[in-house]
Amino acid sequence: MDVLHGHDLYDEQLIDRVGDAVNEDAGDDLDTLEDGQQQQRLGVNRQMDILLDAPQEPPLGVFPAQGGPNGPPRRRKKRSFYTMTKPTPPCQSQEPEMCLLMASVTRAMRHVREDQRGEYFANYLVENMTSQNYPNGMGLPQHWGQF
């Protein structure tokens, strides 16, 4: 911009140096300022130096959209909403809820051969589903699908 006005920065630096030589200065022009102003100016410059020397934040490699050492990023394959896997809720991953009688029947049937399980199941229910074990039907399902 100084070139547009007909002079450049080099000429201004020469003028400052000539002025320093006439005044027998060291060339830093800091001796004309008071001590407080000097320290304040150094502090501002130090802060500016820190800001200018700071790396770019965030680093460019973090965002793949800007490209990187491997070239431009590939487009992601669009997935159908219906084919994406979703985590199952905890209630579906657990065993279904059942009454105490059914739990004990299931546990007992593990020790019986497969061809005898149907008969064993019926006999177990007849023997154990009594009013002594379940007074007034307490603990049994009241309607189909309750447990």
From Swiss-Prot:
This is Male-specific protein scotti. Belongs to the male-specific scotti family. One of its GO terms (biological process) is sperm individualization. Glycans are attached at residue 128. Keywords: Developmental protein, Differentiation, Glycoprotein, Spermatogenesis. InterPro entries: Soti. Expressed in primary spermatocytes and round spermatids. Low expression is seen in very short elongating cysts, but were detected at high levels in a few longer spermatid cysts. It holds the Pfam family SOTI. It comes from the Eukaryota. Residues 82-93 have a biased composition (Polar residues). Disruption phenotype: Male sterile showing spermatid individualization defects. No gross defects seen in testis organization or spermatid elongation but the seminal vesicles are empty. The keyword Glycoprotein applies. Post-meiotically transcribed gene that has a role in late spermiogenesis; required for actin cone progression during spermatid individualization. Residues 55-93 are annotated as: Disordered.
